[in-house]
Amino acid sequence: MSFRTSALSTALMFFALATPGHAQSTGEIALTIAGKDHVFPLDSSQSDWSGRESWPSISLSARAFNDAGEDPKVVSFSFDAGNWMPSLPELRFTHYEDGKAVQKLFSAEDAEDGALTVTLDSHSVNASLLSVSGSIEGSMGTSDNYGRDIDLSNSVPVSGTFTATVEKLD
């Protein structure tokens, strides 16, 4: 190894070690939908928060796969928390089989959309990381337009908990 190669290798190693790492979003969403229990690990690349510390918008995405690592069940859950009072919650659940969505359920805050409620048990902000935990409850129904209009004629109950530590969206 020449001096120049050695110096370059040392410089590259220094910069690799000196580059700050990004914290990973962690947590899970545990739901009971129509009497069936599900636990969804948070998808760290799709979960974050934005806004101010006293008025955050929180967006969580989570997925669970079957034992073969296929046919995911996907949850998207979001809400605002102005002065740490949850509002405007939205919950979406999609179950895939053989690459096709076989079940899609939606819920939101208004009574005609499932009366989804969020209760915050804890919250804290440390630099760009937000930690929250709480529970949700409501009804879920189907929709032909991705949750804009939710049909509750065959609604199913949903309840559960969430715990998450997520990074602020840049």
Q: Which residues does each predicted region cover?
A:
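A broad, structure-centric signal for solvent-exposed, well-ordered loop/edge residues
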Residues: 8-10, 40, 49, 127, ...
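Bacterial N-terminal signal peptides that target proteins for export
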Residues: 1-9
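A generic alpha-helix preference that emphasizes hydrophobic side chains
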Residues: 18-20, 131
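An ectodomain-focused feature that recognizes extracytoplasmic/extracellular
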Residues: 23-113
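Short, solvent-exposed mixed-charge patches
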Residues: 169-170
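Generic hydrophobic-segment detector
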Residues: 6, 25, 124-128
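Bacterial N-terminal signal peptides
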Residues: 9-18
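Acidic, glycine-rich flexible loop segments
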Residues: 95-164
